[in-house]
Amino acid sequence: MKQYKSVLLFALVVVLITACGPKATETPVFQGNNPYAPQTGDSNLMIGDLTIDSSSVFLAKSQPPQVMVNFAYFQPTPCYQLRVEVSGPDTDKHINLKAYAVAEKDKPCALMALATPLQASLNLGSFPSGHYFVMLNGNQIGEFDS
């Protein structure tokens, strides 16, 4: 009987200690669809800058609402491929997108830059309740309430 009381007392102490601990916070993780995610061999490629022509952020009418980002961009030449790194939200509720282009280092490209911008669309997924800011290459392109 004494052993039973000891086990019960120990279990009660453990429950009380865990109940008094910090509340678990919901940490959003990117769970959207990024067809432009960095690839494993990108470290061997040459990186080029993009010029963003236009951008938009909107919520898709779904349950839960999905955050969508569209942007038009110019890349150095058609030989480059788009990459977009998605991070956040950070403590200030900024969702950061870093867009750039990659191309093979030792392969010359004789093609001229395109005169019309290319289009890209990303589904960032859904987020916990709050007010968020979407940043693309350091510039705010939109905000939304979730």
Regions found by a protein language model. Name each.
Residues 26-65, 81-83:
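Beta-strand/beta-sandwich contexts
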